[in-house]
Swiss-Prot record:
SUPFAM superfamilies cross-referenced by the UniProt entry: FAD/NAD(P)-binding domain (SSF51905)
Source species of the chain: Penicillium roqueforti
Keywords annotated in UniProt: FAD, Flavoprotein, Glycoprotein, Membrane, Monooxygenase, Oxidoreductase, Transmembrane, Transmembrane helix
Binding, FAD: 39, 53, 112, 312, 325
Family under the similarity heading: Belongs to the paxM FAD-dependent monooxygenase family.
GO molecular function, one term: monooxygenase activity
Transmembrane segments: 449-471
Glycosylated sites: 409
Protein's UniProt name: FAD-dependent monooxygenase adrH
Annotated catalytic residues: 220
Gene name linked to the record: adrH
Pfam families listed in its UniProt record: FAD_binding_3
Length: 476
């Protein structure tokens, strides 16, 4: 390079102004790497009735970026959970408080809209976030790549990141290009990865007497569950998950209207979820609500050439264990760390195409097994909470309360080992604790594993007698 000439800048095109997309923008900004965010909607933070839970594995990354405090002050940390069953039985647990003590961050819930607002308002270069840019095509140009949007705009860069959700246009374009460049790479099985077995009504309600801030309810129904989180000033975040009568393969999944949400909630309005609180109370006090099909799936192809996908674009899970957004944030941490490493390895030259491909393969290698484990636990959680067979119903009702250490262990394993951004300092609060490993003594509740299996065997032997005491026979 001639003296006085500026080194070429590596540029990342982020498609999707999602939580993952904006978190990546913050990460790249901190690394001084050029980027742009393209959002198809007119607004970055629309109110759609959705909410998210920020768990310790996601919180530590947002804390690294200086964003967590703004979120935390809007919420009430979770300290207690209540579990209830169709026969009226219930019990409580301090698992959320224990998680807080172990990992130094509480579990918090807040409007997805608020999270997006905080990510946007705290972003230093808002001109790099461009709305009304719906992608129509991705082009691979050898030494670069470009994104074409429906209004004819062309954005050229070195790496295209699809953070555009489960209906990802970037994933579709990646598949189209793979069919051209490597026929057979995207198998028929992969094209059918996403399935739908559940529908979900999301809602946010004003304060309801009897529901305390910082608490959480999980009602185990028969083929459905109701989960609530009680935030600051009594604001109630809730969702109802209903098992469908068949399994659908994406994109052939049901679509739902506000009337469908009302019909489902009316059908189960008298179901008591805790003490004298009913589903009808949630519905009558709602501020916003929406109903959607819940896709599930983990894709095998994460990248092609200069294209990569993350978050719901590559692994979609139900909200039962609250890890969808947190898993996406972990994707961001790994990808941003790798981009920073390859971009700053040579101040005079941009990374070659082969270097980028190697980096993206490493991204999948570093993330795949952890994402798969979280996805599988989420998948199990949906079926356990909705009691979709007799064994899950029996264990949930008669064993679950006696194996608190086992549940703590499983939850801790989901959170421990979380990825962080390697070029940013560790958050101050982790000086006395670490989310990237389990504290000594955690992770070995052998006696409770034994109790679980022995109890399950006893329940199986006494199954004919127990049937008469369970409220529904729909899953026999």
């Amino acid at each position: 390079m001639e003296e006085g000439m500026e080194a070429p800048k590596f540029k990342v095109i982020i498609v999707g102004g999602s939580i993952a997309g904006l978190t990546l923008a913050h990460s790249l900004s901190q690394a001084n790497i050029d980027h742009v965010v393209l959002e198809k909607r007119a607004s970055i933070a629309p109110q759609e009735g959705a909410f998210i839970g920020v768990w310790p594995n996601g919180a530590q990354i947002l804390d690294q970026l200086g964003l967590y405090h703004s979120l935390e002050k809007l919420t009430a940390p979770l300290s207690r959970m209540h579990l209830s069953f169709p026969d009226g039985y219930s019990f409580s647990s301090l698992l959320p408080k224990t998680i807080h003590e172990i990992f130094k961050y509480p579990i918090v819930s807040l409007d997805r809209q608020k999270v997006l607002e905080i990510l946007f308002q705290n972003y230093p270069n808002k001109e790099k976030i461009i709305t009304n840019q719906r992608v129509s095509e991705v082009r691979l140009l050898g030494d670069s790549a470009s994104v074409v949007t429906e209004d004819g705009s062309v954005f050229q860069g070195d790496l295209i990141v699809g953070a555009d959700g489960v209906h990802s246009r970037i994933r579709s374009e990646m598949w189209r290009l793979a069919d051209e460049l490597h026929p057979g790479m995207i198998t028929p099985q992969e094209r059918q990865t996403l399935t739908v077995e559940y529908a979900c009504v999301f809602g946010i309600s004003r304060a309801i007497p009897g529901l305390r801030s910082g608490e959480h309810i999980n009602h185990y129904g028969d083929k459905f569950c109701v989960i609530t989180f009680h935030g600051k000033d009594g604001r109630v975040f809730w969702f109802i998950i209903q098992k469908l009568d068949r399994v659908y393969t994406y994109p052939n999944a049901p679509r739902y209207s506000p009337n469908d949400a009302a019909e489902l909630c009316d059908k189960i309005q008298d179901v008591i979820i805790w003490r004298d609180i009913t589903v009808g109370d949630l519905w009558k006090t709602k501020l916003v609500s929406s109903m959607t099909a819940l896709e599930e799936g983990l894709f095998e192809t994460w990248s092609l050439n200069r294209i990569v996908i993350l978050g719901d674009s590559v692994h979609k899970m139900t909200p039962n264990i609250g890890q969808g957004a947190n898993t996406a944030i972990e994707d961001v941490a790994v990808l941003a760390s790798l981009i920073n490493r390859v971009v700053h390895a040579d101040a005079l030259h941009k990374p070659s195409e082969s270097c980028i491909e190697t980096m993206l393969q490493k991204y999948k290698t570093l993330r795949y097994e952890r994402a798969k484990s979280t996805y599988e636990r989420s998948r199990f959680g949906a079926r356990f909470h909705t009691r979709d067979n007799w064994l899950k119903a029996l264990v949930g009702r008669y064993v679950f309360q006696y194996v608190g250490g086992l549940i703590e262990n499983r939850t801790s394993k989901t959170l421990a080992g979380g990825n962080v951004i390697d070029f940013l300092p560790r958050p101050h609060r982790l000086e006395t604790g670490c989310v990237t490993r389990l504290p000594k003594g955690q992770g070995r509740p052998q006696q409770q594993w034994t109790l679980l299996w022995v109890s399950s065997l006893v329940l199986f032997l006494f199954l004919p007698w127990l049937r008469s005491y369970l409220p529904s026979a729909t899953f026999w």
